[in-house]
């Protein structure tokens, strides 16, 4: 089951990366795992470093992918992003600022939505 979840997660990250590339984003890293958490995608556009949370659901029968990104999830992504920046000062100093985005995907309806600069 764990391996299947990883495979599904990778599929979602790949779909999100493709969408963002088409929108002019540069992909710096994918599936960056640390002891503080995982950053699905790290991308850049207009000198902004962006940490992207990706949520993929096969259907919306039991809720939307957006419902999976609440206050606690955003706080975890923010903390992981801050630790990433502390541990990568050369990367951190290259950019004007950073933000958190999300890409939500529903396979059944082929819906893929990019939410920019999330706050909580």
Model-derived features: positions:
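Acidic-basic catalytic patches of nuclease active cores, encompassing PD-(D/E)XK
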Residues: 1-30
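Residues at secondary-structure transition points
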Residues: 3, 7, 11, 36, ...
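Acidic active-site catalytic centers that drive phospho-/nucleotidyl reactions
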Residues: 13, 38-40, 53, 73, ...
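Active-site metal-binding core of divalent-cation-utilizing nuclease and nuclease-like domains
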Residues: 26-49
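Conserved catalytic cores of phosphodiester-cleaving nucleases, focusing on short active-site segments
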Residues: 41-61, 77
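Mid-chain, well-packed structural core segment of small domains
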Residues: 62-92
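Domain-level recognition of nuclease-like catalytic cores that cleave nucleotide substrates
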Residues: 87-120
